[in-house]
């Protein structure tokens, strides 16, 4: 086997929430370029949009990140169902970047998702996330911060995600669903209430990938242990 270093979940400067980078794009890129072992694949992550992916791709196209062989978009969501820690379940959509029009197709698909607030529907795109943020903040907020507020409030339903996949052949063929398995913001946070058992199974069945750094969780999903070993 030949091991390659991937980072499938990397936020970048300008990410809509919890942006700890500021505008230091050069520092961000240099950290990746100088990493050892070399990082060959990056999943550029943002909440509800692919703006950070587009920015990193533009840097790559301009000659930065020469050792990175593949960059793909990772769109992060919080689901409407919450764990016992009161955190929305963390779900990611990992898109294939092979098609030349993948950006347009992804943004079209994301705009099919909506969140209802005070009897109004807000679509999953930058303009309507800003409108949601302003509505939640009573309007007294600039567009940039409003987008962050809107992204923080927007939650997605499992039924809406299923509908998006069902109605969009390109998404079905070019997107993997990943879900966190942690107690904090993952499906393990639903195991303490038996009434959520079926929903937990539905979410995990919908996913293609389970994100976890826990050795017991890894062994369970690799079929090396039983659910009793997770307790």
Describe the function of each predicted region.
Residues 1, 55-211:
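Extended substrate/RNA-proximal surfaces in nucleic-acid metabolism proteins
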Residues 1, 7, 180, 226-227:
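C-terminal regulatory/interaction regions
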Residues 1-88:
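An N-terminally biased module of ancient metal coordination in phosphate/nucleic-acid-related enzymes
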Residues 212-217:
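His/Asp/Glu-enriched short active-site or ligand-binding loop at hydrolase and phosphoryl-transfer sites
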Residues 222-223:
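Extended non-globular interaction regions in eukaryotic gene-expression and organellar proteins
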Residues 231:
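Eukaryote-biased recognition of electropositive, low-complexity segments
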């Amino acid at each position: 086997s030949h091991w390659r270093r991937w980072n499938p979940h990397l936020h970048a400067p300008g990410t809509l929430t919890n942006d700890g980078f500021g505008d230091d794009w050069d520092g961000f890129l240099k950290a990746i370029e100088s990493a050892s072992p070399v990082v060959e694949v990056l999943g550029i992550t943002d909440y509800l949009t692919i703006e950070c992916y587009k920015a990193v791709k533009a840097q790559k196209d301009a000659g930065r990140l020469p050792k990175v062989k593949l960059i793909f978009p990772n769109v992060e969501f919080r689901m409407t169902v919450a764990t016992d820690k009161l955190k929305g379940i963390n779900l990611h959509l990992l898109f294939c970047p092979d098609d030349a029009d993948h950006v347009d197709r992804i943004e079209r698909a994301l705009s099919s998702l909506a969140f209802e607030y005070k009897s109004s529907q807000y679509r999953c795109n930058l303009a309507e996330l800003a409108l949601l943020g302003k509505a939640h903040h009573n309007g007294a907020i600039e567009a940039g911060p409003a987008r962050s507020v809107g992204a923080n409030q927007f939650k997605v339903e499992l039924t809406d995600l299923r509908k998006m996949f069902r109605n969009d052949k390109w998404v079905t063929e070019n997107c993997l669903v990943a879900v966190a398995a942690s107690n904090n913001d993952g499906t393990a946070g639903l195991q303490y209430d038996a009434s959520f058992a079926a929903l937990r199974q539905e979410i995990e069945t919908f996913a293609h990938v389970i994100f976890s750094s826990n050795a017991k969780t890894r062994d369970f999903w690799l079929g090396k242990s039983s659910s009793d070993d997770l307790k």
